[in-house]
C-alpha cells in the first residue's frame, strides 16, 4: 500500500493548462501530464534559482522529494519538446495548496 501524499505548498498558478507544438492539432499529439508540485519544483529551482534545500523548505517537503520532483518534471518537459507532445498541467487540488 502506498503512503499517503503529504500536502505540498504550491504558489504557482499558471495562466494556461496546456502547451503544444504549433501547427499540429491537439488530437494528433501524445499527452504528457505535469503535476502541480512538479511545476512548482521547477519554478523554485530553475526560474527562481533557489538551492534544492531552500526550495524543499518552501514546498514543505524533504530535499530528496524535491529532487525527485525536479527530475521527473525536467524529463517530461524535455520529452515534450523533443518528441512533439502536448504538455498538460494538472489542476491544483485545493487540499494541497496554500
UniProtKB/Swiss-Prot annotation:
InterPro entries: UPF0251. This is UPF0251 protein VC_A0091. It holds the Pfam family DUF134. Belongs to the UPF0251 family. It comes from Vibrio cholerae serotype O1 (strain ATCC 39315 / El Tor Inaba N16961). Signal peptide: none annotated. It comes from the Bacteria.
Amino acid at each position: 500500500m502506498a503512503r499517503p501524499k503529504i500536502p505540498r505548498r504550491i504558489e504557482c498558478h499558471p495562466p494556461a493548462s496546456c502547451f503544444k507544438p504549433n501547427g499540429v492539432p491537439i488530437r494528433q499529439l501524445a499527452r504528457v501530464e505535469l503535476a502541480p508540485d512538479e511545476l512548482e519544483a521547477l519554478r523554485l529551482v530553475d526560474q527562481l534559482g533557489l538551492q534544492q534545500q531552500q526550495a524543499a523548505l518552501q514546498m514543505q517537503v524533504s530535499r530528496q522529494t524535491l529532487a525527485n520532483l525536479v527530475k521527473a518534471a525536467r524529463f517530461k518537459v524535455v520529452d515534450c519538446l523533443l518528441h512533439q507532445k502536448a504538455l498538460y498541467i494538472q489542476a491544483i487540488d485545493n487540499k494541497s495548496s496554500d
